[in-house]
Amino acid sequence: MTSALLGLQIVLAVLIVVVVLLQKSSSIGLGAYSGSNESLFGAKGPASFMAKLTMFLGLLFVINTIALGYFYNKEYGKSVLDETKTNKELSPLVPATGTLNPALNPTLNPTLNPLEQAPTNPLMPQQTPNELPKEPAKTPSVESPKQNEKNEKNDAKENGIKGVEKTKENAKTPPTTHQKPKTHATQTNAHTNQKKDEK
């Protein structure tokens, strides 16, 4: 029965396509939905034979689709989930109460501390107190320039290094050459003012 309905469904689909393509369009192009004719499907008038045939074939197509759905559901009413096999022979996930070993389970044996048993990181070298530096490294201090010069002189004397002292001349920055003197700018302003006065 379902194979006959399926064949009829295919024939109806092909017939609907052919009948719709043979019909004359009710309106042309984009002007179908505007202008004097305000109806959606074109001018209302007596329906032609092709229009009636299209409606009849469409109604048969819908009825055939509903019938196919009903018969397929009746014939193959089983779900895929109904056909899956379940194993009832599975062992329980939680073991019996007497089989737990309290020596290995930290929740049952409070004497075990998981932090004490944690392995150390083999990538990190272990430092002993003998390897620590004797004096901390000197950090630069934020002091006045005079105090910094005194500290540098004292450090140079302690370390035995000569010629480290800075002079005030070395600390100054040389003047830049890209700056223009202001006298030139004032001369040009005076020159432009004279031109304005002449006009």
Swiss-Prot record:
Source taxon at top rank: Bacteria
- Give start-end positions of Polar residues composition bias: 118-130
Region Disordered, residue ranges: 92-199
Q: InterPro entries, from UniProt?
A: SecG
- Which locations, inside or outside the cell, does it occupy? Cell membrane
Specify residue ranges for compositional bias: Basic and acidic residues.
146-171
For molecular function, the Gene Ontology terms on record are: protein-transporting ATPase activity
What residues form the membrane-spanning segments?
Answer: 2-22, 49-69
Q: What are the record keywords, sorted? A: Cell membrane, Membrane, Protein transport, Translocation, Transmembrane, Transmembrane helix, Transport
Question: Low complexity bias located where?
Answer: 97-115, 172-188
Where's it mainly located?
A: membrane
For biological process, the GO terms are: intracellular protein transmembrane transport; protein secretion; protein transport by the Sec complex
Protein's membrane topology? Multi-pass membrane protein
Q: Name one GO cellular component term.
A: plasma membrane
Under the heading NCBIfam families, the entry gives:
secG
Purpose: Involved in protein export. Participates in an early event of protein translocation.
Q: Which family does the UniProt entry place this protein in? A: Belongs to the SecG family.
Q: What is this protein called?
A: Protein-export membrane protein SecG
Gene name of the record: secG
